[in-house]
A protein has these predicted regions:
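Formylglycine-dependent sulfatase
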Residues: 2-244
């Protein structure tokens, strides 16, 4: 018989913000879809879960993923509720039961505005956005392990750059929670987008759908850039989970 593979897999959890089945390839809901070759490739080579439900808003969903508990038990039921540091997180459990894993959260947190909250929840490395949104994807506050500074780097690209750098520095099995802010408002045309869409706010407000889709396409491109930065062996040994 073939030898058993004892190599522990890496785990990559990718979270899109405000993206439903209407914008997801492979589902019949809605006929206008963004172009997402990276996600389509993952779906075609993986498993598609068709009976999965989430909270309709950010904070309770993220708290449930982090703790495995319903909002009625964590008291996180509304946008902006703070998750108590007394809760046991998946990172706490990994620290206890799988200490060989390194782990990070990169991107949107939205469980507290305390810059030390992610590390208090057991996260080895946090770099991202504490709040629920930004006024501009190109002018926002980046918090990295407790230190907050303004950045003008495009958020979707910056999160990917941080993810690439972190993954590249790992020497042991890893778990990366990569939470994009896209395609959450404000709707806009991403930099470098191959489109002739006008960029004034009146045009966006009049017909936001193509801008929403362009933001998703930019995120899909960045997912591809992250995957392409890995070696074939590392990518083959990585469990990739995409949720919206």
């Amino acid at each position: 018989s073939d030898p058993v593979n004892t190599t522990k897999p890496n785990i990559l959890l990718i979270i899109a913000d405000d993206m439903g089945l209407d914008a997801t390839p492979g589902f019949s809901i809605d006929t206008s879809k963004p172009n997402m070759p990276q996600l389509e490739a993952l779906m075609n080579s993986g498993v598609r879960f068709e009976n999965v439900w989430s909270n309709p808003v950010c904070t309770p969903t993220r708290a449930t993923i982090l703790t495995g508990r319903y909002g009625l038990r964590t008291n996180v039921i509304n946008v902006g509720d703070v998750l108590s540091t007394n809760e046991t997180s998946i990172f706490d459990l990994m620290n206890t039961n799988a200490p060989e894993y390194s782990h990070a959260v990169i991107g949107k947190w939205h469980l507290s505005t305390d810059p030390n909250h992610p590390t208090s929840m057991g996260v080895d490395y946090f770099a991202g956005l504490l709040a629920g949104g930004v006024q501009s994807y190109s002018n926002w506050n980046l918090t990295e392990n407790g230190d907050t500074n303004n950045t003008t780097e495009y958020a979707t690209t910056k999160f990917t750059d941080l993810a690439i750098d972190w993954v590249d520095s790992q020497t042991q099995p890893w778990f990366l929670w990569l939470a994009y802010n896209a395609p959450h408002t404000p709707f806009h045309l991403p930099p470098g987008a191959a489109s002739s869409l006008p960029t004034d706010s009146a045009s966006i407000e009049a017909n936001p759908l193509p801008y929403y889709q362009a933001m998703i396409e930019a995120m899909d491109f960045e997912i591809g850039r992250l995957l392409e930065s890995m070696t074939d062996a590392e990518r083959d040994n990585t469990v990739i989970i995409f949720v919206g």
